Design a protein with these regions (language model features):
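N-terminal pro-sequences and low-complexity stem/linker regions of secreted or lumenal proteins
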Residues: 1-143
């Protein structure tokens, strides 16, 4: 316990990844809940941010059209949850995020230079009149 690197990515094995058609969504939910229970017991928990997200929307219908940018996205909405002692409690954050928001947060947190692909995404969004893509900080209470 307490030995996770500063940044860790975890992807469940296929039968637990909640992909419709071949994975059991309920078992995937149970698995993620179990992982979170273990993380919450970790000595690192007080300084941890967990983002649970997916690589696509799974083909489920969504009433909201994707934001306009270039042909590369951002695409349709995907679910994401922030679980952390730093998460704003009882809040649904309406900031526009995409999968680069995780990279944006890491970049912000450690004062790293913006990656070229992220800068290109920002340019495409601005040219299309789209909203700024967030870096997760709007969902957090940081000191």
């Amino acid at each position: 316990a307490g030995k996770l690197p500063t940044v860790t990515f975890y992807k469940p094995q296929g039968n637990l990844n909640e992909h419709s058609g071949y994975a059991d969504v309920a078992k995937g939910d149970e698995h993620i809940a179990d992982v979170l229970r273990h993380l919450e017991k970790s000595p690192q928990w007080d300084h941890m941010l967990v983002v649970v997200t997916y690589d696509e929307n799974g083909g489920w219908w969504d009433h909201a059209a994707p934001p306009k940018a270039d042909r590369f996205g951002p695409g349709s909405r995907i679910p994401a949850m922030i679980i952390s002692p730093f998460a704003k409690k009882g809040v649904v954050d309406h900031t526009l995020y995409d999968t680069t928001s995780i990279i944006r947060f890491i970049t912000h947190r450690w004062s790293l230079p913006t990656l070229p692909g992220v800068a290109m995404r920002d340019e495409a969004m601005a040219k299309a009149g789209g909203a700024r893509i967030g870096d997760l900080t709007d969902a957090l209470v940081l000191q």
